[in-house]
Amino acid sequence: MKFADVAVDAPAGHGRTFSYSIPDHLDIVQGQSVKVPFGPRTLQGIVFAVVDAPQVEETRDIADTLSAGALLESHQLSLARWISEYYLSSLFESAALMLPPGGRFRPRTFYSLSPNVDDVAEAANSPHQQRFLEYIQRHEVVDAGRLDRALGPNSRSMAARLVERGLLESKVRSSSRQMTHKLVEHIALNPEMLEEIGVWMKNAPRRSARQATLVDALLEADAPLPATETRKEFGAHNVARLRERQWLTFTQQRTDRDPLAGQMFAPESAVGLTSQQQSVTDAVCAGLDHPDEAPRTFLVQGVTGSGKTEIYLAAVERCLELGRRAIVMVPEIALTQQTIERFASRFPNRVAVLHSGLSAGERFDQWWKTREGDYDIVVGSRSAIFAPMLNLGLVVVDEEHEWTYKQQDSNPRYHARDVANKLAELTGAKVLLGSASPDVSSYHRSLAKQYGLLILPDRLSVSKNGKPTPAPLADVDIVDMRQELKEGNRDMFSRQLDAEMEACLDAGNQMILFLNRRGTASQLQCRSCGHQMRCAKCDIALTYHRRAGRLICHYCGTRHRIPERCPQCLGYRLSYYGIGTQSVAEALEQRFPDTTVLRWDRDATRNIADYRELIEKFRTGEGQALVGTQMIAKGLHFPSVTLVGVVLADVGLSIPDYRAGERAFQLLCQVAGRAGRGERPGRVVIQTYQPDNYAIQASAAQDYQSFYNKEMAYRRERGNPPFNKLIRLLHTHINQATCEHEARAVARTMADERDARGIGSIEILGPVPAYPARLRGRYRWHIVLRGPEPRALLDHVALPRDWHVDIDPVSLT
C-alpha cells in the first residue's frame, strides 16, 4: 500500500503534513488536490509526497480526489514549503496561493432529518434534542453555521451524535463556487449529408435564399460557428429547418473568457536604446544567457522617465528567444492596463493577465491557458508571482519599493519580491527589480553585491525622429506654507502654485495635483471642547465626504450621519478642518471654472473599468487637471503633464513608523516624476510645513543617494532593517482589558524564554497599542521582535489564538 503526505486545510504548525493511506481505487500523485477526513470533518488537502511508509502507525484513507491530476508542480511545492517555513504559515495556506481560481474546497456540512424518523418527539432523548430535531424538521436542510447561530455553539456536537444514532443525515458540500471552463454551442454542417446538401444548393428555391446563405457561410468557415450568433445573423427559423433535415451538427466547445478581448493593440517594434540603456540591457541579457551564474537578481535604479520599461521589454524579448517564459509584476491593478498595452503591442497574443480586478471566469481561463502553455508572459499584480509558469526564465518587479507587494490582511503575509527571489532560485530564473527610489534594503543588498546594481541616471524623451534623447528632470520648488500663513494667504494653494496652475492651463497643458488623503476634509471637531468625531469601531478620525453627506471610516467603511451637536459637550461649534482630494478638486473647479477636473482615488474609482475610463479621459485631453492620491504617483506616463502640485507633503511624515520618511520620499519622488515626460519641460511645486525635512529636501532634488545615506544613518543608530530583522506580533480582541492582559502575558513569556536561552541579541519592543488602537470593533496590541534572527524566539514560544505573525513587516501601524 502507498501513503500520501498531505497538507490539510486546518490549523497546523508551519511545514506540517499528515499521513493518509491511498485506497486502491484512487490514483494519487504529488501536487494533487484531495478530500481527506480530519477529525469529524472532511477537508481539502494537497498531496506533497507519495511515500512507501507513513509518519504514524494508524492512518485513514484519502476520501476522494478534487482534481483529475496534479495542480502544482514540484517547484511550486518547494516554494510553498519555503513560504510556510519563512512566514510561519500553514503549509496548506502557502500552497493554496498557487491553486487555480475556484480551486479551494471550503466544506459546509448540511443536516437533514433522516427519512426513518416518523415522530420527532418519540425519537428524542431529551427536550433539548426534541427542539433541535424540530428546528431541522421545520427548515428541511440546515448548514452547520446556521445551527451555531440559531441553537448555540454546542450544536455541531449535538448534530454529530444524532447522525451516529441515525436520526440525522449529513452531507458535505463546498461553499465556494465551482469554476469550470465555459462551453458554448457551435454549429457545423453534417459531413455525412454533404452530397444531399450539394444537390439541394444547385436547385434551392428563392424562398430558401437565407438557408442557402447559411449553408455557404458554414461551408466557408474554417471551424464551427457559435450557435447564438448564427441564429441572430441567419434567423433561428432557418437554423431549425436545416436541423430538421439533419444537415447540421451541434457541439459544445470551450470558449475562453479573455480580459483583452476587444482591445486593440497597435503592433510595436523595439525602439533604439541609448548607450546607457543598452549597457543595462546587455548586463541583464548576459545574466539570462548564463542562468547559473551570479547575480540571481538585478536592481535597475533609474530616475523617473529613464526608460526602465524598455529595459523590461528587451529583457523579456531575450528570455523568449531563449525558449523561456516571464512574469511581469506591477504594484497596483490600476497600472496593469498601461503595462499590458506595452507588452501586448510588442508581443501580440503572448500575454496573459492575472489580478483580482478580473472576473472569476476570466481569472480561471487565464490561469489554465497559462498552465497549458498558451501564453509566454504573465502581467499582473502581487498574486501573479504564483502563476503556473513552466520553464520560467525571468521575473520583473516594477516599482519594487512599493509596499503593496506585501500581503498584509491574511496569511501567509508574504512579500512578492522576496517570493520572486526564492522562485528564481528554485527555477534557475533571473529577477529584475526596477525603481527610481528603491527600497533601502534592496539598495543595501546591491551595494553588498547580493544584487547586481544597474543605474540609469538620465531622464529621456522621444524626439521627433522617434529616438530617445536625454531630457532634464522637472524643476522642483519647495513652498513653506508657514510663510504663506504669515503673509495672510489661508488658501490651500500657495501663491506660487496658483500662478503655476494658471500658466499651465493658459498654455494648453495638463497638470496633476497630489494629496495623500481622500475625502473632503480630514476631521470634524468641536471648537468648544476639542472632541474629534471618531469611528465607534476603529480608533481613527472619521473623514467627511461632502457629496455623500456622511462621515466615513476609511478602515471599516462605516458611514455616520453628521451630528448637529457635539456628542461630548452638546455644543454646536462643530468645525471641519483639513483637506482631502474631493475638497481640492472642488477648490480647483471654483478657481478655474472652465477647467475639467478629474479625480482619482479609491472613492472615485472603484474597479478596473473606472481606472481605464479615467486614464483614457486624461490621456485624450478630456480633463486638464487630475487630482488624486497615491495611485497617480505610480508609473503613469502622461506626456502632456507639465505641472505637478503636491498640495501637502507632510501627510504621513508623523505616522509612528520607522519607514515614514522612506515612504514620504518615495511618494514625492514618484509623483514629481509625472511632470515633463513629453517634449515640454516640467515643473513641480511641493507645499509643506516642514521644508527642512530630509525626505522632502532629497525628493525635491531627486537625490536618492543623499536620502539613502541619511536614512541608513538613522536606521543604523536605532537598529532597524536592514541592520536587524523585525517580526511583528499583533493581538486583537473585542475587550480592551483582555487584549492588553494577553499581550503583556505573551511579552513576559517571551522575555523569560529569551533570558533562559541566553539570546540577548533579540529585543522585545512593547507591548503597546497598535495604530490604530481599535479596528473594526477589535482592540489591537502588538509586540515587535528585533534582532539578527528574532524568529529563533518564536521557535520556542507557542502563541495563543488571535495572534497574527508578520515576518519582515513593511509597516508597524
Residue ranges of predicted features:
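Inter-lobe coupling/hinge segments of SF2-like helicase ATPases
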Residues: 268-278, 282, 293-740, 782-784, ...
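Generic solvent-exposed, charged/amphipathic alpha-helical segments
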Residues: 81-84, 148, 585, 589, ...
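C-terminal accessory/connector segments of nucleic-acid motor ATPases
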Residues: 89, 100-110, 115, 124, ...
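Hydrophobic, Leu/Ile/Phe/Ala-enriched alpha-helical segments that form helix-helix packing faces
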Residues: 151, 218, 588, 671-675, ...
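Accessory, non-ATPase domains that flank or precede helicase/AAA+ motor cores in DNA-metabolism machines
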Residues: 1-435, 442, 447-471, 772-778, ...
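Generic structural signal for residues in well-ordered beta-strands
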Residues: 168, 248, 351, 476-478, ...
